[in-house]
Amino acid sequence: SQSRLEFLRRASVMDRLSGDLCDFVLETTGSAALLRDLSRANMLLIPLDRSDEWFRFHPLFRDMLESELRKQEPAIERELNRRASDWWAGRGDWDRAINHAITCGAVGRAGELLWLGIPEYVTRGRNQTVISWLDMLGQEAVSSDAALSLTAAATNVTRGDGVMAEHWVAVARRLLEEEGAGSGELGVFLN
């Protein structure tokens, strides 16, 4: 049916699916039952657990659906990714939250999430993951967001590059002064 096809196409922004996640991101109800039905009907939806709570699309099917969504409803795709980012952030899954924020172009949100997650990434030796995200966002985005600049500074500290760390701290300080946010959470960190 058309409503199932729309559900599949819009759900394709997510690499893992659950009823709660789909209900939140797609602003609907009854997703858990629909996911179970689609999985049983062999709609290229693969269960990830014995309780049929989590699913994933076959990768090629997901790529096709996501490509279709991007062509037909680019604004909706961005909004779905924004909501998915919010859902995952609310559950402390920084990787998925950050990936969705980057995908929808929410630079400020990505910076906020990266900054919140940086202690965990640094202490677990996941500096390269953070660097990859900063590279995906690009130099211009990092240079225009205080949280991203501070995240770049932290990654440079862990790599032992004090010169670049100081550069990014200076960029963040300038941005916060321009915004008049020197007394906020990030500003307190710099003082």
Residue ranges and their predicted role:
Residues 1-6, 185-186, 191:
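Short intrinsically disordered, low-complexity coil segments enriched in acidic
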Residues 8-12, 152, 190:
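Short alpha-helical scaffolding segments that buttress acidic/His motifs in well-ordered protein cores
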Residues 135-144, 175-189:
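Flexible helix-coil transition and linker loops at the boundaries of alpha-helical arrays
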Residues 74-159, 164-168:
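Extended alpha-helical scaffolding segments used for macromolecular assembly and cargo binding
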Residues 49, 72-73, 105, 140, ...:
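Structural signature of alpha-solenoid helical repeat scaffolds
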Residues 1-70, 79-82:
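C-terminal boundary/linker of central alpha/beta nucleotide-binding cores
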